[in-house]
Protein backbone atom coordinates (compact mmCIF):
# COMPACT_ATOMS: atom_id res chain seq x y z
CA UNK A 1 0.00 0.00 0.00
CA UNK A 2 2.74 2.46 0.96
CA UNK A 3 4.66 1.69 -2.21
CA UNK A 4 1.57 1.85 -4.42
CA UNK A 5 0.59 5.18 -2.93
CA UNK A 6 3.99 6.68 -3.75
CA UNK A 7 3.84 5.45 -7.33
CA UNK A 8 0.27 6.51 -8.00
CA UNK A 9 -0.14 9.24 -10.62
CA UNK A 10 -2.92 10.67 -8.43
CA UNK A 11 -0.68 10.97 -5.37
CA UNK A 12 0.01 14.46 -4.07
CA UNK A 13 3.55 15.55 -3.19
CA UNK A 14 2.73 15.02 0.49
CA UNK A 15 1.50 11.48 -0.21
CA UNK A 16 4.69 10.70 -2.14
CA UNK A 17 6.81 12.05 0.73
CA UNK A 18 4.82 9.95 3.21
CA UNK A 19 5.34 6.89 1.02
CA UNK A 20 9.13 7.37 1.04
CA UNK A 21 9.25 7.70 4.83
CA UNK A 22 6.91 4.75 5.36
CA UNK A 23 8.93 2.53 3.01
CA UNK A 24 12.17 3.45 4.81
CA UNK A 25 10.57 2.68 8.18
CA UNK A 26 9.07 -0.58 6.90
CA UNK A 27 12.51 -1.69 5.63
CA UNK A 28 14.02 -0.88 9.04
CA UNK A 29 11.26 -2.92 10.68
CA UNK A 30 11.86 -5.86 8.34
CA UNK A 31 15.60 -5.73 9.08
CA UNK A 32 14.84 -5.86 12.82
CA UNK A 33 12.62 -8.96 12.57
CA UNK A 34 14.02 -11.95 14.38
CA UNK A 35 16.48 -9.84 16.38
CA UNK A 36 16.08 -9.83 20.13
CA UNK A 37 15.36 -6.43 21.61
CA UNK A 38 17.36 -6.16 24.84
CA UNK A 39 15.31 -3.32 26.33
CA UNK A 40 11.82 -3.01 24.80
CA UNK A 41 11.07 0.22 26.70
CA UNK A 42 14.16 1.91 25.26
CA UNK A 43 13.26 0.62 21.80
CA UNK A 44 9.76 2.09 22.12
CA UNK A 45 11.27 5.39 23.30
CA UNK A 46 13.65 5.37 20.33
CA UNK A 47 10.82 4.76 17.89
CA UNK A 48 8.42 7.30 19.40
CA UNK A 49 10.84 9.89 20.75
CA UNK A 50 12.92 12.70 19.45
CA UNK A 51 12.15 14.77 16.41
CA UNK A 52 9.98 12.64 14.21
CA UNK A 53 9.20 13.35 10.62
CA UNK A 54 5.74 14.47 9.62
CA UNK A 55 5.06 10.94 8.38
CA UNK A 56 6.21 8.85 11.38
CA UNK A 57 3.08 6.69 11.56
CA UNK A 58 4.92 3.38 11.02
CA UNK A 59 7.47 4.12 13.76
CA UNK A 60 4.76 5.29 16.14
CA UNK A 61 2.60 2.23 15.54
CA UNK A 62 5.62 -0.03 16.09
CA UNK A 63 6.30 1.75 19.37
CA UNK A 64 2.70 1.38 20.55
CA UNK A 65 2.79 -2.33 19.72
CA UNK A 66 5.87 -2.80 21.91
CA UNK A 67 4.31 -0.73 24.68
CA UNK A 68 1.08 -2.73 24.66
CA UNK A 69 3.11 -5.94 25.00
CA UNK A 70 4.97 -4.44 27.96
CA UNK A 71 1.70 -3.37 29.58
CA UNK A 72 0.28 -6.88 29.21
CA UNK A 73 3.26 -8.23 31.17
CA UNK A 74 3.31 -5.54 33.85
CA UNK A 75 0.45 -3.10 34.29
CA UNK A 76 1.47 -1.62 37.64
CA UNK A 77 4.12 0.74 38.95
CA UNK A 78 6.56 3.21 37.49
CA UNK A 79 7.48 1.10 34.43
CA UNK A 80 3.80 0.79 33.48
CA UNK A 81 3.36 4.53 33.99
CA UNK A 82 6.37 5.20 31.77
CA UNK A 83 4.96 2.91 29.06
CA UNK A 84 1.60 4.68 29.30
CA UNK A 85 3.31 8.07 29.01
CA UNK A 86 5.23 7.05 25.88
CA UNK A 87 2.06 5.51 24.41
CA UNK A 88 0.18 8.71 25.17
CA UNK A 89 2.79 10.78 23.37
CA UNK A 90 2.70 8.39 20.41
CA UNK A 91 -1.10 8.46 20.16
CA UNK A 92 -1.00 12.25 20.50
CA UNK A 93 1.15 12.35 17.37
CA UNK A 94 -1.05 9.75 15.68
CA UNK A 95 -4.15 11.86 16.36
CA UNK A 96 -4.37 12.99 12.78
CA UNK A 97 -5.19 9.47 11.61
CA UNK A 98 -8.43 9.45 13.58
CA UNK A 99 -7.48 8.48 17.12
CA UNK A 100 -8.34 11.99 18.37
CA UNK A 101 -8.16 11.96 22.16
CA UNK A 102 -6.88 8.45 22.89
CA UNK A 103 -3.64 9.93 24.22
CA UNK A 104 -5.57 11.63 27.04
CA UNK A 105 -6.65 8.26 28.43
CA UNK A 106 -3.04 7.08 28.47
CA UNK A 107 -1.96 10.16 30.42
CA UNK A 108 -4.76 9.64 32.96
CA UNK A 109 -3.91 5.94 33.36
CA UNK A 110 -0.25 6.87 33.79
CA UNK A 111 -1.10 9.19 36.69
CA UNK A 112 -3.23 6.46 38.29
CA UNK A 113 -0.51 3.80 37.95
CA UNK A 114 2.30 5.74 39.57
CA UNK A 115 0.98 8.78 41.45
CA UNK A 116 3.43 11.26 42.95
CA UNK A 117 6.29 10.28 40.62
CA UNK A 118 8.30 12.13 38.00
CA UNK A 119 6.57 10.06 35.31
CA UNK A 120 3.12 10.98 36.63
CA UNK A 121 4.20 14.63 36.60
CA UNK A 122 5.20 14.35 32.91
CA UNK A 123 1.85 12.72 32.16
CA UNK A 124 0.00 15.47 34.02
CA UNK A 125 1.88 18.20 32.14
CA UNK A 126 1.06 16.57 28.80
CA UNK A 127 -2.59 16.14 29.79
CA UNK A 128 -2.79 19.75 31.01
CA UNK A 129 -1.26 20.96 27.74
CA UNK A 130 -3.80 18.93 25.74
CA UNK A 131 -6.74 20.25 27.78
CA UNK A 132 -5.53 23.85 27.55
CA UNK A 133 -5.03 23.57 23.81
CA UNK A 134 -8.48 22.01 23.44
CA UNK A 135 -10.12 25.01 25.08
CA UNK A 136 -8.01 27.62 23.28
CA UNK A 137 -9.27 29.84 20.54
CA UNK A 138 -8.82 33.26 19.03
CA UNK A 139 -10.31 34.84 22.17
CA UNK A 140 -7.91 33.03 24.51
CA UNK A 141 -8.15 30.02 26.80
CA UNK A 142 -11.56 29.33 28.34
CA UNK A 143 -11.35 26.29 30.61
CA UNK A 144 -14.71 25.34 32.16
CA UNK A 145 -14.77 25.27 35.96
CA UNK A 146 -15.16 21.47 35.99
CA UNK A 147 -12.05 21.06 33.82
CA UNK A 148 -10.05 23.41 36.07
CA UNK A 149 -11.14 21.41 39.12
CA UNK A 150 -10.25 18.14 37.42
CA UNK A 151 -6.81 19.49 36.47
CA UNK A 152 -6.19 20.66 40.04
CA UNK A 153 -7.14 17.22 41.40
CA UNK A 154 -4.92 15.47 38.85
CA UNK A 155 -2.01 17.80 39.57
CA UNK A 156 -2.22 17.01 43.27
CA UNK A 157 -2.24 13.29 42.49
CA UNK A 158 0.58 13.49 39.94
CA UNK A 159 3.17 15.75 41.53
CA UNK A 160 5.99 14.04 43.39
CA UNK A 161 5.73 14.40 47.13
CA UNK A 162 8.19 16.85 48.58
CA UNK A 163 10.46 15.49 51.27
CA UNK A 164 10.59 17.60 54.44
Where are the predicted features?
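Acidic, polar-rich low-complexity tracts and alpha-helical solenoid repeat scaffolds
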Residues: 1-164
Amino acid sequence: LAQAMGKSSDATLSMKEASKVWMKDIREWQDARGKTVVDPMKEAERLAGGRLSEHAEVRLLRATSILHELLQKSSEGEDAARALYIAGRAYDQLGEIGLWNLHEFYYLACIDKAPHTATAEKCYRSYDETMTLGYSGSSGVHLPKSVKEDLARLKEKAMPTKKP
